[in-house]
Swiss-Prot record:
Name of protein: Probable phenylalanine--tRNA ligase beta subunit
GO biological process: phenylalanyl-tRNA aminoacylation
Alphabetical keyword list: Aminoacyl-tRNA synthetase, ATP-binding, Cytoplasm, Ligase, Magnesium, Metal-binding, Nucleotide-binding, Protein biosynthesis
UniProt xrefs under InterPro entries: aa-tRNA-synth_II/BPL/LPL, B3/B4_tRNA-bd, DNA-bd_dom_put_sf, Phe-tRNA-ligase_IIc_bsu, Phe-tRNA-synth_IIc_bsu_arc_euk, Phe-tRNA_synthase-like_B3/B4, PheRS_beta_core, PhetRS_B1
Subunit: Tetramer of two alpha and two beta subunits.
Source organism per UniProt: Vairimorpha ceranae (strain BRL01)
Length: 504
């Protein structure tokens, strides 16, 4: 889960109330969060707080403050209100990353802590919601340095000329300048081969090159009070969500929308979802007797707005920043959090079941026992493998957001793992006799998740004079133990995977 660092003094300043570390930890725990680490410094305490992956609104101290203001003090959470304006961005790019949204925050007063929090929140949104800028990227600019209107367009790489963030010298080749930069270089993969996508103001100054870097000319600082926030990406919903999040956390009384004009005018849509909820539904799931008024109070403490219809029903409005709410079940979960899980009566379920071991796991354990009695040692290898190692992977499931080349695909055979185990233990005495019982994954269009699991047994023998009978014998024993009598061994002509005339 993502974590945020919050200074004790700053969060207490935002909340308007002081808590000792133990009390604050209990408050967060009851809310569904957890302090991962408490770092004591000479003049302050820093809390490292684990945030659920779907609560993007809590990834900064300001967003956490708004949530706790409602939870602790029952303060009604107000959604953001954007005023209309004459600020305009002309969209002339309609290819990759054509989704654009923008807004302006006016009269925001930064201090060092809130400025650092603003920059950190921007990066966390791009990293989590934006999948490391592959789906969404965000740029923030000093409004007072921009000449309007602004154009979002594609230019040839030879036309690029600007000073990147924290650089005073102008450059005309991003790839050459940032190819060895560990922080910026990883985003160059999202740039087109022949063109750069840029925001350019009326005087021809480049504001940013999404999703790589902003211009140093429009860099914001602690003294910046008026901020342009622009968000681009491949998905309109995620682009709008990302913009709503940062506007909500760093709100002022003077925020305005930026008109995106292409073939039609596009305005940032902030639509609130609503649900009709009854106390009977809450009782069914949580087994608590509660009045509709008390239910309304609980929901308000979890940032919702309510409208009581009658003594059993109320309408619940979900604020736009609560993108984690997808179903009534999420509302009921929040009710349980606010009510307190320890306050819910525990009852025995109406249906009693007798637990038993899964039949497949039971059979797998018996196979393991037989293989061990045959002199083989069990190994456990990685389920994720590289594409090059997954030689049986013609129909394998590939990981879309892998962290390393060793974790590109889900294994479709146990064989590569066994070979790696041997290669890592060549110092051991021979013969080496190892086996593994484990799941492999294949793509399957008929499955509801697009793939299916299969449980495989694989064994490997290494010796000075290895022969086919060294593994054929154990396999014969296993087949007979399983009651399989009608089987035969055939030659297997696959020179990619086995030596010629050495497989069956």
């Amino acid at each position: 889960m993502p974590t945020i660092s919050v200074k004790k003094r700053e969060i207490e300043k935002l909340l308007g109330k002081s808590y000792d570390s133990e009390t604050f930890s209990d408050i967060l725990f009851n809310y569904g969060l957890e302090i991962d680490e408490c770092i004591e410094e000479s003049d302050d305490i820093t809390y490292k707080i684990e945030i659920p992956a779907n609560r993007y609104d809590l990834l900064c101290a300001e967003g956490l403050n708004y949530a706790l203001q409602s939870y602790l003090f029952g303060k009604v959470f107000e959604d953001i209100n954007l005023q209309s304006s004459e600020y305009t961005i002309f969209k002339q790019h309609f290819g990759n990353r054509s989704c654009v949204a923008a807004a302006i925050i006016k009269n925001y007063k930064f201090d060092k802590y809130s400025y650092d929090s603003f920059i950190s929140y921007q990066e966390k949104l791009c990293g989590n919601l934006g999948r490391n800028r592959s789906l969404v990227s965000m740029g923030t600019h000093d409004l007072d340095t921009i000449s309007w209107p602004v154009t979002y367009k594609s230019i040839k790489k030879t036309e690029l000329k600007f000073a990147p963030l924290n650089c005073t010298k102008e450059i005309n080749d991003l790839e050459m300048h940032f190819k060895d930069d560990k922080n910026i270089g990883k985003y160059l993969q999202y740039v087109d081969n022949d063109n750069y996508i840029v925001f350019m103001d009326a005087k021809g100054h480049i504001l940013s090159v999404p999703p790589v870097i902003n211009s140093n000319r429009t860099k914001i600082s602690v003294n910046t009070t008026n901020i342009l926030v622009e968000v681009t990406g491949t998905n309109t919903y995620k682009v709008n969500t990302c913009l709503k999040m940062i506007l909500s956390a760093f709100r002022t009384d003077n925020m305005c929308q930026v008109n995106i004009i292409s073939d039609k005018q596009e305005i940032l849509e902030i639509k609130d979802k609503s649900y009709l909820l009854s106390i009977d539904e809450v009782y069914k799931e949580l087994n608590i007797n509660i009045s509709v008024i008390d239910l309304s109070d609980l929901l308000i403490k979890m940032m919702y707005k309510t409208n009581i219809i009658d003594d059993k029903h109320l309408n619940v409005t979900v604020p736009s920043v609560r993108q984690d709410v997808l179903h009534k079940a999420d509302l009921i979960e929040d009710i349980a959090i606010c009510y307190g899980f320890n306050n819910i009566n525990m009852v025995m379920p109406d249906i009693n079941t007798i637990g038993s071991e899964n039949r497949l796991n039971k059979f797998s354990d018996k196979l393991r026992l037989e293989m061990c009695m045959l002199g083989f040692t069990e190994v456990y290898t990685m389920v994720l493998v590289s594409k090059s190692d997954n030689i049986f992977g013609d129909n394998s499931a590939v990981v879309s957001n892998y962290k390393s080349l060793e974790c590109e695909a889900v294994r479709s055979s146990l064989y590569p793992g066994l070979m790696k185990a041997v290669s890592s233990n060549l110092h051991c005495k021979i013969p080496i006799k190892i086996f593994e019982v484990g799941d492999v994954v294949f793509l399957d269009s008929e499955s509801d998740v697009g793939a299916r699991n299969r449980r495989y047994l694989s064994c490997l023998y290494v010796g000075n004079k290895s022969h086919l009978e060294d593994v054929q014998g154990p396999m014969t024993v296993i087949l007979e133990k399983c009651g399989i009598k009608d089987y035969k061994f055939e030659r297997m002509d696959d020179e990619k995977k086995y030596l010629k005339n050495q497989s069956a």
